[in-house]
Structure formats: structure tokens, C-alpha cells
Amino acid sequence: MAVGKNKGVSKGGKKGSKKKVVDPFTRKDWYDVKAPNMFKNRQVGKTLVNRTQGTRIASDGLKGRVFEVSLADLQNEQDAERSFRKFKLIAESVNGRDVLCNFHGMDLTTDKLRSMVKKWQTLIECSVDVKTTDGYLLRVFCIGFTIKDSVSQRKTCYAQHSQIKNIRQRMTTIIKREIINSDLKGVVEKLLPDSIAKDIEKACQVVYPLHDVFIRKVKVLKKPRFDLSSLLELHGDGGGKAAEVSTGAASGVVVDRPEGYEPPVQESV
């Protein structure tokens, strides 16, 4: 038997020793997650956060959260071509009970990527760092696979090293051309139908036939300084309360005062 007192075990029989169990969800609130107006389905879902208590503000706990949503859910379509693409949305501001999100990245599902890799073909991929017109630095990854043409009798369809370099160069050129002259909203609108990948597939047919060409991933490396008005424009609220407040404060109101008027001195504040 051990000698000494066990400080971890308290003597029973004391009144008030049992603490009242409080459900943690009673201290939390639900907020609606709103996607930008580039997508058909603006209501992405709901998220929980602790209520504002003391110096802990609820909106500060929401900002910076990243939500990953399938493109099929964002577009309200059950098309198989949309279900394997995932868009990341980041919470940037809170308006009442709405969490206003912005584009934060795109990715393909793991099962789609694994299903495309097969034998007897060449995998070609590239990555490009491009800056949009509104100051977002994006890293875009592209992937494609060679395919046999109708004339070939071979079992394999391997591309030569010079052809791979040529295809990779064409991928880089097209991605830069499509993104460097667009803002973030324009880039997302091009990612929805994957028009950049289709242009790459057409341009590379001259070098070697390709199939399963996709923009595999998009990362946001750098962002410009946060601007609430541009975020409200993305959500279709550009002429809302924030614009009215700014215009009202800028215009002001002219009040007639007699000459020599002095405001009264306040005794208490």
C-alpha cells in the first residue's frame, strides 16, 4: 500500500462538489455561409461560432475560416463533370448573420486524379505563377495525358522529350494569356467550365494528341489589401448600406448658423 496522501482524490460527501453540466451549444450561434455571385447557389451552408463575450468577438472567430465545396453543389447541378472539382471559399467579412466568402483555391478530388493515371501513356503537367489585374498572385497547376491517334497501331502512346517540352511550353503560355488580363472574378468564371484546359487541349493536338486535360489545382499565394467595397460587389451588394454610409459621410449636410455662433459648453460627457 502506498504511503502518503493522494492529492488527486478528494473526499466525498461535500456539498456543491458536483458541477452543473452545461451544453456547449447553448453558447454558440449559427451563421449562414454565402458564396460570391459567380456561383448559382449562394447559400453554401451554415457554421457555428461562440457568441460575443467580453473581448472575444464572434466575427473575429469566423474570419479566415476555409470552406471546401463541390462545384456540383455550388452550381446546383448533378453533372459528373462538376462533381469532382472542389472550390475553397474563405470567410473575409461578416454582415449580420451572413459570412461573406471569397475564392481561395480549387482542387480535384483524389479519386478523379488516381483514376486518370494509367499505363502506356505519358503524363504531362506544369505549374505557373500568374498575377491577376486586381493584385492576386495565383499558382495554377495543369495536367494532361497523351492518347493514341486513330492511325497508330501501337499499344503505347509515349511522347518524346522534345514533344513534352513543347506541350508544357504551350500550357504555360495559354495559362498566362488567359489569367494575366483578368481579375479574380474573371478567372473563376473561366474555371467553372474549365475553358482554359479545353484551349490547351486544342492547341496541343498539333504536337501530340491529348485527353483528360484539366486545371488540376489553383492556389492563392498573395492577396491585395482587404477592401470591403470590392467584396460587397462580388456578393451583389455594391450599392448597399456600406455605399450609402460612405456617400452620406462624404456629402455631409449644410446647416445655417448666425454670425458669431458658438456651441454650448457641455457640463458632463
UniProtKB/Swiss-Prot annotation:
This is Small ribosomal subunit protein eS1. One of its GO terms (biological process) is translation. Belongs to the eukaryotic ribosomal protein eS1 family. Disulfide bonds: none annotated. It comes from Anopheles darlingi. The lineage of its organism: Eukaryota, Metazoa, Ecdysozoa, Arthropoda, Hexapoda. GO terms for cellular component: cytosolic small ribosomal subunit. GO terms for molecular function: structural constituent of ribosome. It comes from the Eukaryota. Pfam families: Ribosomal_S3Ae (PF01015). PROSITE patterns: RIBOSOMAL_S3AE. Component of the small ribosomal subunit. Mature ribosomes consist of a small (40S) and a large (60S) subunit. The 40S subunit contains about 33 different proteins and 1 molecule of RNA (18S). The 60S subunit contains about 49 different proteins and 3 molecules of RNA (28S, 5.8S and 5S).
